[in-house]
């Protein structure tokens, strides 16, 4: 049975996951600044740098400003930030699984640099695959560092898979997308867990 705090953290993870699913398409709202499939939103650059900034020593004033009235413990604030980061990265990874299988690698299917410069099909594929791997590796490693029972971790992973499949199945060419997910996610999950256990020893 999860404690109330762990239930809150799990909720934060899944809400952040849903936010991460939608985050890459933020470029559609900013289409006059960022072309669709912008390298800035279709990857882990923003969450990675934001998380590193917020977890730096002396850089937690933003967290304290918005959460101090609700949460008094620095440890709890950091836990919530960690779970939000984990969920957000996983959401981006699922979204990129969908983006890897367009009808054709032309136009909006390609990753764009600032100033609407396309990086081409091969680099677009490599970028998305690389970001899927690193997003999941970071997220799953951090999740396995958490003080949760193995059963709870496995249930969270199962829920992630179910959410991902539901998200992908409503899209076109869903068989290829789901196949990529059901192969890559468990492999990286196992890889992240084994790596964590080796470090822990």
Task: Write out the residue ranges for each language-model feature.
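N-terminal membrane-targeting hydrophobic helices
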Residues: 1-201
């Amino acid at each position: 049975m999860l404690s109330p705090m762990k239930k809150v953290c799990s909720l934060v993870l899944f809400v952040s996951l849903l936010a991460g699913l939608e985050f890459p398409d933020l470029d559609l709202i900013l289409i006059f600044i960022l072309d669709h499939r912008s390298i800035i939103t279709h990857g882990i650059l923003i969450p990675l740098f934001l998380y590193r900034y917020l977890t730096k020593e002396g850089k937690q004033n933003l967290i304290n400003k918005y959460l101090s009235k609700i949460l008094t413990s620095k440890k709890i604030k950091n836990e919530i930030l960690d779970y939000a980061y984990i969920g957000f990265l996983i959401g981006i990874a699922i979204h990129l699984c969908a983006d890897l299988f367009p009808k054709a690698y032309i136009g909006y299917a390609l990753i764009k640099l600032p100033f609407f410069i396309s990086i081409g099909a091969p680099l677009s594929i490599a970028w998305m695959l690389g970001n899927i791997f690193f997003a999941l590796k970071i997220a799953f490693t951090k999740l396995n560092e958490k003080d949760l029972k193995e059963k709870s971790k496995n249930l969270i992973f199962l829920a992630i898979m179910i959410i991902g499949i539901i998200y992908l199945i409503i899209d076109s060419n869903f068989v290829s997308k789901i196949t990529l997910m059901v192969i890559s996610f468990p492999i990286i999950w196992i890889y992240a867990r084994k790596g964590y256990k080796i470090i822990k020893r």
